[in-house]
Swiss-Prot record:
Annotated substrate binding sites: 2-3, 8, 36
Keyword presence, Hydrolase: yes
Source organism of the structure: Escherichia coli O157:H7
Similarity section: Belongs to the Nudix hydrolase family.
Protein name as it appears in the record: GDP-mannose mannosyl hydrolase
Motif Nudix box in this chain: 50-71
Cofactor note: Binds 1 Mg(2+) ion per subunit.
Catalysis: reaction(s): GDP-alpha-D-mannose + H2O = D-mannose + GDP + H(+)
Name of the gene encoding the protein in the UniProt record: gmm
Amino acid sequence: MFLRQEDFATVVRSTPLVSLDFIVENSRGEFLLGKRTNRPAQGYWFVPGGRVQKDETLEAAFERLTMAELGLRLPITAGQFYGVWQHFYDDNFSGTDFTTHYVVLGFRFRVAEEELLLPDEQHDDYRWLTPDALLASNDVHANSRAYFLAEKRAGVPGL
């Protein structure tokens, strides 16, 4: 369910949002990042993902979001659960008058690059970066870099 902008602003102002983030790896061990065109995190490189909608199962959200973000509909079983994360932003989708808080479920999976049809609605460019390269870049948002920090990986299988 998509809300009118005024209703969505009330939700964002009042409650955390639930989202899925995708830690997408190619065959060379590089990870997909898109340069965001919208708030929050506008102008930063960020892993793909998106919000879970009201009354939407996680399975349905995973399929909808992989299609919307990658052009490839994948079942939730394609991803390895990568933990629960918290993202806090000083701005929101419409400006800076209130903050945004996400509770994020991370999923990691590998894809064949040639199967992806990357959209341009929320990102104006895409890159594949190694963990070392993305950790070294201040253009990669701290919330995306956190998925690759050694101290964060300790309890998360896979990386």
